[in-house]
From Swiss-Prot:
Reaction catalysed by this enzyme: alpha-D-glucosamine 1-phosphate + acetyl-CoA = N-acetyl-alpha-D-glucosamine 1-phosphate + CoA + H(+); N-acetyl-alpha-D-glucosamine 1-phosphate + UTP + H(+) = UDP-N-acetyl-alpha-D-glucosamine + diphosphate
Record's protein name: Bifunctional protein GlmU
Residues annotated as binding UDP-N-acetyl-alpha-D-glucosamine: 8-11, 22, 73, 78-79, 100-102, 137, 151, 166, 224, 330, 348, 363, 374
Location of the region described as N-acetyltransferase in the Swiss-Prot/TrEMBL record: 248-452
Gene Ontology CC entries for this record: cytoplasm; membrane
Species of origin: Aliivibrio salmonicida (strain LFI1238)
């Protein structure tokens, strides 16, 4: 579809009581403006013009990688003035879609309907009917067709009774829009250039104005304060949870589940309460996720159990694995099939072989660990000397006793045994027992120190 988009994002957001621009506050882990940008990109917008004002440096630092044209509105003189800053970029014959960076939930379906509804030479306008329209511009109709929009502060008492309100989202042709914007005046209670005045201008020219309703009213709710943002967050999460339930995912309590990215699921998935999904997560068949887990950018294969309060980021977990409770898998962690990682174990940049176990109180970093290895409680791969990192290599069928330190770089051969409490600084051969302990010393009739 041949259209360009303008996203208005210049507002300061005073009621957020924040040092950053309002549209950078996140919903589902993503800046509100990014939600709107993604909607435009999903529909194939030819150009996306982002109109910014306050906090320009922060805006570009956060959204600088996006495919947008940056348009500065140095003075905030109204919505019409804001769109007009981008108007030199409009092609005369293209559709121009106007959206808002603080209205993050607008859907592709609603935008498609709006684009399709634009009459030739006219305007398609997104409206909604509210029980309490206080604060919004009212839609003025004459015998059916829309003829104008009147803002709350300029409305008569009779007009204030109207419940159909303007969302601000609209579509017009670029050439017409440029002409109407250039003719705007600021003769109103706010002293601003209202975008909504182009509706009356179009009507005066005999152009049709087509009103379209959103798929869901929540889509057009804006954010002015943190309470409104929290409300939209819950609405968004409820919708995501409902989709997963309909796809066969068992959410034990849909109201206590947060999806802040994308989730690909197999069959018979079970997710307990207070689980957070971030980035891109893939779950195979029959995966169970315990309460309080955080999963980010990870893949978990079939028949694996993630026990409560585990944090998994940038990791790959094979089939029939058990993780947790209270496990941390960091980027580069790879658990092969039937591996087990237990409570208070941290794993980073490690391949843990098939059937291997590290069940208690262990740090494994920068290591290659073979099959059927048993890593005892309190084992540490000492991978960092204060300047550089080094690798530990452990062969198949190795037993590493509790409270051992493996000082990298070091290699432990297949079938070797490391006695509990050992510090390993040199390579250990296959099937070798390595043990290093200080000689025990005993003092009879020992007297403990007493307080003075």
């Amino acid at each position: 579809m041949n259209f360009s988009a303008v996203i208005l994002a210049a507002g300061k957001g005073t009621r957020m009581y924040s040092n950053k621009p309002k549209v950078l506050h996140t919903l589902a882990g993503k800046p509100m403006a990014k939600h709107v940008i993604d909607t435009c990109e999903g529909l194939g917008a030819k150009n996306i013009h982002l109109v910014y004002g306050h906090g320009g440096d922060q805006m570009q630092a956060e959204l600088g990688q996006e495919r947008v044209t940056w348009v500065l509105q140095a003075e905030q003189l109204g919505t019409g003035h804001a769109v007009n800053q981008a108007s030199p970029e409009f092609s005369d014959d293209e559709k121009v879609l106007i959206l808002y960076g603080d209205v993050p939930l607008i859907s592709t379906a609603t935008v498609e309907n709006l684009l399709d509804a634009q009459p030739t030479g006219g305007i398609a306008l997104l409206t909604v009917v509210l029980d309490n329209p206080m604060g919004y511009g009212r839609i003025i109709r004459r015998n059916g067709p829309v003829i104008a929009i009147v803002e709350q502060k300029d409305a008569t008492e009779e007009q204030k009774l109207i419940k159909e309100i303007n969302t601000g989202v609209m579509v017009a042709t670029g050439g017409d829009l440029k002409r109407w914007l250039a003719a705007l005046k600021n003769e109103n209670a706010q002293g601003e250039y209202y975008l909504t005045d182009i509706i009356a201008a179009a009507h005066d020219e005999g152009r049709a104005v087509e009103a379209v309703h959103p798929v869901s009213p929540i889509e057009v709710e804006g954010v002015n304060d943190r309470a409104q943002l929290a409300r939209l967050e819950r609405a968004y999460q409820a919708a995501q949870a409902q989709k997963l339930l309909e796809q066969g995912v068992m959410l034990r309590d849909p109201s206590r589940f947060d999806l802040r990215g994308s989730l690909q699921c197999g069959m018979d998935i079970e997710i307990d309460v207070n689980v957070i999904i971030e980035g891109n997560v893939t779950l195979g068949d029959n995966v169970v996720i315990g309460a309080g887990c955080v999963l980010k950018d990870c893949e978990i294969d079939d028949n694996t159990i993630i026990r409560p309060y585990s944090v998994i980021e940038g990791a790959t977990v094979g089939e029939k694995c058990t993780v947790g409770p209270f496990t941390r898998l960091r980027p580069g962690a790879e658990l092969c099939n039937d591996a087990h990682v237990g409570n208070f174990v941290e794993v980073k940049n490690v391949r843990l072989g098939e059937g291997s176990k590290a069940n208690h109180l262990t740090y494994l970093g920068d290591a290659e660990i073979g099959k059927r290895v048993n890593v005892g409680a309190g084992v540490i791969t000492c991978n960092y000397d204060g300047a550089n990192k080094f690798k530990t290599i452990i062969g198949d069928d190795v037993f590493v006793g509790s409270d051992s330190q493996l000082i990298a770089p070091v290699t432990i051969g297949n079938g070797a045994t490391i006695g509990a409490g050992s510090t390993v600084t040199k390579d250990v051969a296959e099937n070798e027992l390595m043990i290093s302990r200080a000689k025990e010393r005993r003092i009879e009739h020992w007297q403990r120190p007493t307080k003075k």
